[in-house]
């Protein structure tokens, strides 16, 4: 009896080794799981359900099989915020609000991707506010596939260049934002990703903030059970089929 949390896999056609590792995880690690939560950035980029790459469609079929055995939940990240109902249905995933509260074996828990907590990054927060507008998302969806892909590639390039010049503090969550969300939700645990800095933080207010890691060099999964929390690393195996 346990609930699993992952995020920041950044799956792409350029890194099929990560997709292979994730498929291996789905095949081998879920037998005793009550649910699987994917906390955003499942894909490196997602410009619309109508442009899903072949590897993504294969993954949808795999997740659909998993969803027949246990519920699979998804929260949008900053890379896959355009992932829609069409793909979610194909994958058997239920899309959750960007901030969701759970009762995890008697412990009130708030889960989210985590980018909303990086409030010191003013430029990114302005972009995040714009992209959250329904009108902006609708207009983007009306563009041609080629134009959407070009815009996404341009944003990724600028983001990568900009992040090289940002400090560690700006790129991390802001403590006041963390405390405010915990106070608003009355949660004891906060679980998020985004920062790629896996850790279990014991806060001064008695709460815990748990950060799931990325899947660039190895897998990262958080297991929560009635016995407690366990943040695990999953080495990529060359023997994965």
UniProtKB/Swiss-Prot annotation:
Cystine pairings recorded for this chain: none
Catalytic activity: UDP-2-N,3-O-bis[(3R)-3-hydroxytetradecanoyl]-alpha-D-glucosamine + H2O = 2-N,3-O-bis[(3R)-3-hydroxytetradecanoyl]-alpha-D-glucosaminyl 1-phosphate + UMP + 2 H(+)
Lineage: superkingdom: Bacteria
Residues that, per the record, bind Mn(2+) 1: 8, 10, 41, 196
Record flagged with keyword Membrane: yes
A GO biological-process term: lipid A biosynthetic process
Enzyme class label: hydrolase
Cellular localisation: Cell inner membrane
One Pfam family per UniProt: Metallophos
Family: Belongs to the LpxH family.
Entries under PANTHER family matching the protein: UDP-2,3-DIACYLGLUCOSAMINE HYDROLASE, UDP-2,3-DIACYLGLUCOSAMINE HYDROLASE-RELATED
Protein name: UDP-2,3-diacylglucosamine hydrolase
UniProt organism field: Shewanella sp. (strain W3-18-1)
